[in-house]
Amino acid sequence: MGLMIRSSSIHAAGCYTTSRIAKGVQVVEYTGPRITKQEADARFRNSPTTYLFGIGDGSTVIDGHGTAMYINHSCDPNCETEELDGRVWVMSLRAIAPGEELTYDYNLYDGDEDDARCHCGARNCRQTMYSSEEIARQKKALKQKARRAVEAKRRKAAAVTQAKKGGKAASRSNARKKATRR
């Protein structure tokens, strides 16, 4: 199958087909060294660009090398990934014309501070490469963080109010003691 790497309007470089691809075909394998997620996190902590692909339960990662690592994300993809016998294949979802850029939905699942902005330009673009499940998880975590911040602020305000009341009470008590000593 003829594939080539060239400039992409989605992101830097992309993978394009030079021949027609039928629906349901194994287009290319996602290859590279397999490392643990912890090793990948440490190795790529400060790297703005990675070609990592989580497999199995997500504890193992393929550090992408080869043609498949240039396949960009799209919210309206023409391919999908499938794990078969421990190997990751990019499969065509529909017939793909020669010259068309290959894409699949990354469905990122382990978000951090990065918003993983999507630039696919699809009509149904969700503006991020995170999966719907990860988006929901991040929103829930953000709400919990906001609730904790509000609760902490409320506790601090209550403590300040209590301290002011305690201070006044102590002052009145000291004034009474002084008055009775005379």
Regions found by a protein language model. Name each.
Residues 75-182:
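C-terminal SET catalytic tail plus cysteine-rich post-SET Zn-binding segment of SAM-dependent SET-domain
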Residues 1-82:
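Catalytic cores of histone-lysine modification enzymes
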